[in-house]
Amino acid sequence: MAISELATGLKFPEGPVAMDDGSIILVEIAGGCITRVKKDGRKQSIAKPGGGPNGLAIGPDGALYVCNNGENFTYIKQQGLTIPSHAPAHHKGGRIERVNISTGKVEVIYDTCDGETLIAPNDIVFDTIGGFWFTDHGTTTDKGRTHGALYYAKADGSKITRVLRELLSPNGVGLSPDGKTVHYAETMTGRLWSLPLTKPGKGTKVPGFTPGVFAGAFPGLAYFDSLVVQAEGGAWMDTILAGGITTFWPGTSRVEHTPIPDPVVTNICWGG
């Protein structure tokens, strides 16, 4: 695989979205901002929502929808790498934001569900009817770990539903090509889960005690981050520590790993 570096100096970039003009819009989690990287590598500021913009997607109205973790991480330097660590003491929760790409205007559309504050929204994917799924990563402090959840919401801000709760560090989320299954990854367990859907936003109750149908795990120590699903159904998973992208084919035992010379691969998008 040929790899080229497009831009440097970004503050923990994630959530890339490939635009029609060849640019990439992404978040800088540690910078609290959203940035466009042009084809020649030049950077342009889109918005500065603050907190910790984490996941990003284009909605049906052409706006950016942002999973903002509310500054859920502090950062440490380790072996020349910047690594997310425990939440700072001032972290109070996160939110879902809508951002006008042209003006940079930021609007909070969700920060609670059923009266409970969103902890740290992480990744987001839209379905074909204009609703979106997102993960809430939960948080880690010196007192322990707070579980996360999987949500479904309407883009107009009118309804949000917690579909699964008590998940351990849910991160990447994607939909099967037919839209009948939502896949999500857990970072700390290094597992990929699938949840069959009965209709948009409604999951099937899975027998037993698992939070979905087990869809895969890396054969060794690895953490999972974001994911995308290809047209053929393979779930491409950013695989931390293993240094690459691991492709799972839910419902089969097929697993493929593409090495990348970086131990902390955190996000991916389709483009071109």
Describe these PLM feature segments:
Residues P88-G104, H147-D156:
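Beta-propeller blade signature
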